[in-house]
Amino acid sequence: MEKKWWHKTVGYQIYPKSFQDTNGDGIGDLKGVIRHLDKIEKLGANVIWLCPVFASPMVDNGYDISDYMDIDPSFGTMEDMKELIAEAKKRGIRILMDLVVNHSSDRHAWFQAALKDPFGKYGKYYVFREGKDGKEPNNWRSIFGGSAWEKVPGYDNLYYLHIFTKEQPDLNWENPKLREEIYEMILKWMDLGLGGFRLDAISHLKKNYQYTNLPPDGPDEYNMAFE
């Protein structure tokens, strides 16, 4: 079998927030990464795995994305990102971005629209369900503790699914329209010259939506449905 480039590459992971600050605000930025590309090249790395830099409220260190086509201002601008991609390419280095598509931020435009109309187009981009017997739809526990369901403001018995924090509503991968949006976003980044993505929480995309309670595995009567 012919090996692809990613089978024989050397990667260098960067957590931008603590890498290098170039503007004195105490937070590392994309310009700081650009400044060190020559050193990274000398190390023999030909891939940089960039931890989250997408626009985000930073509830979960950037793994709560509010805009898939923008950079968080704390790290710089889209122009900085384009420059990083271009400068890295000159040195034979590909940039991989950390991408989360199991969920978005609750500040994302899709979810804001979904809250206004949970049964409309964007409501179907997420997972909304009615509660049962005055409780959540089922006893699934969030990975961060507590129920994986959060009540929708303005509704007496409607909840949305979040297997991480309540500020990270799960995307509905059973919806082909949602999948198309994600694929289009990925292609836009590839057109900008991005080398690819490291997909976070990818094992959680497929879920069993039978919505039945599971045997409680703790005193809170919830069950860790997601490993």
List PLM regions with ranges.
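Active-site and adjacent substrate-binding regions of carbohydrate-active enzymes
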Residues: M1-E227
